[in-house]
Amino acid sequence: MLLATFKLCAGSSYRHVRNMKGLRHQAVLALGQELNRRALGGPTSGSWINQVRRRSSLLGSQLEDTFYSDQDLAYIQQGEEAMQRALDILSNQEGWKKESRQENGDEVLSKVIPDVGKVFRLEVVVDQPMERLYEELVERMEAMGEWNPSVKKIKILQKIGKDTVITHELAAEAAGNLVGPRDFVSVRCTKRRGSVCVLAGMATDFGEMPEQKGVIRAEHGPTCMVLHPLAGSPSKTKLTWLLSIDLKGWLPKTIINQVLSQTQVDFANHLRKRLESRPALEARC
């Protein structure tokens, strides 16, 4: 009940304060503080999904004393909405079908979501502390092309506050070049609630990065990675990756499903190799 009220209050208040000239920024800060106060006062849940969903609120962590333009606020809202939608999908345990399971226990599941399409869910355990994964996936985001063959380049186009960025990602060809060059422009939102880190995002429009010649502009749906220490083994990390992509173009569904499922398996393997070969930074999420 609190979560439903939480979302409704945040959404309607956000639209209202955007039209309040002169008082917009102060109203947003007050709203965020009040929502956080109410959320943190709620009952404790044993589920890490509910822990994040309950404490994550629209604009709730954007409390630094900074002025945001209307466009900045729109990006922040979009990132928060992507996170909430992705966590909603992950929190529903019904209807998931097994795509593959590796000898090391890595598992890919899939599910068809109305108005979203087929999504894929990677479940892995990485023999590294959560902070190490955060360093590579957030602090070193633009270096992902160095270790992930599925990515040619990632560039941060704009930073908004401490939680939100706009990125441009150029993906490599896949399936023996049957899937040609794609790129993505996305808004990404990063949060930590207790011992859980969530990295979420979805496609967005960014005027300074128009479509590129010879490259198909694909779109991320609501997607996220959830990181938290493995129960009983805090030096290990449980990683859950919800992947939702519209590759655009004329591609058979069988090829799309095969590419996306294998992309997740390969990602886990390449991430492990990267973490083993690189020193840690002094970073905390």
Curated annotation (Swiss-Prot):
Subcellular location: Mitochondrion
GO BP annotation list: cholesterol metabolic process; intracellular cholesterol transport; regulation of steroid biosynthetic process; steroid biosynthetic process
Protein name: Steroidogenic acute regulatory protein, mitochondrial
Reaction(s) the record says it catalyses: cholesterol(in) = cholesterol(out)
Complex and partners: May interact with TSPO.
UniProt GO MF annotations: cholesterol binding; cholesterol transfer activity
Presequence positions on this chain: 1-63
Function: Plays a key role in steroid hormone synthesis by enhancing the metabolism of cholesterol into pregnenolone. Mediates the transfer of cholesterol from the outer mitochondrial membrane to the inner mitochondrial membrane where it is cleaved to pregnenolone.
Sorted UniProt keywords: Lipid transport, Lipid-binding, Mitochondrion, Phosphoprotein, Steroidogenesis, Transit peptide, Transport
CDD domains: START_STARD1-like
SMART domains linked to this entry: START
Associated pathway: Steroid metabolism; cholesterol metabolism
Residues annotated with Phosphoserine modification: S57, S195
InterPro entries: StAR, StAR-like, START-like_dom_sf, START_lipid-bd_dom
Organism: Sus scrofa
Boundaries of every START domain copy: 67-280
